[in-house]
Regions:
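Non-heme di-metal
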Residues: 1-180
Length: 180
């Protein structure tokens, strides 16, 4: 992680986790993002022609669903969302869960670009969660959950990077999608 990104994450983390009400909203956003990722992964299971990737996408989708539940539970522990508000958020999320013009993220991007997207997003999450943990944010229970989730995130980063590297070796121009 570059020093500028680390500085940004450190400052943003302090604000996001220490301002009253912000931790709940941040955890809620994480829960929704993880649920959307779960749907993307299950769509990839159906769309890929690569049998070796089906198992990885399926495992990844199960992880994302579990993470969504963990983050939603942390939101409830903080006491933010009432049932009516949660239902409204859920309905909006289901309408916006990666389906654009009737196509999933995997269908719009194709497998190589999808894997590059997954790699970048998962690597960002690992960096972000590590900054939170280094700063001792926000509380012990959430930190324990982040540590558990990080184990899955490392798997996601590893398999997606391995696949991106295979596409590179096959001559596909992956650098445009990946940050250096």
């Amino acid at each position: 992680m570059g020093w500028l990104r680390r500085c940004y994450l450190t400052v943003a983390s302090e604000f996001s986790w220490r301002v009253p009400g912000r931790p709940q909203r941040l955890l809620g956003a994480f829960a929704l993002a993880e649920r959307g990722s779960m749907l993307d992964m299950f769509a990839a299971v159906e769309a890929t022609k690569r049998r070796d990737m089906r198992k990885k996408y399926f495992h990844h989708g199960l992880d994302e669903g579990r993470h969504a539940l963990i983050f939603a539970e942390r939101v409830r522990a903080f006491g933010l969302l009432g049932r009516a508000e949660a239902a409204l958020e859920d309905s909006g999320q289901l309408l916006e869960a990666g389906i654009v013009g009737g196509k999933t993220l995997f269908e719009r991007m194709g497998e190589p670009e999808f894997l590059a997207f997954v790699y970048v997003a998962e690597a960002d999450a690992v960096e972000q969660f590590n900054v939170y943990l280094e700063r001792g944010l926000p509380d012990d229970a959430t930190q324990a959950q982040l540590r558990a989730i990080l184990k899955d995130e490392v798997f996601h980063v590893t398999y997606s990077r391995t696949e991106v590297d295979k596409y590179r070796k096959d001559g596909l121009p992956m650098d445009a999608t990946l940050r250096k």
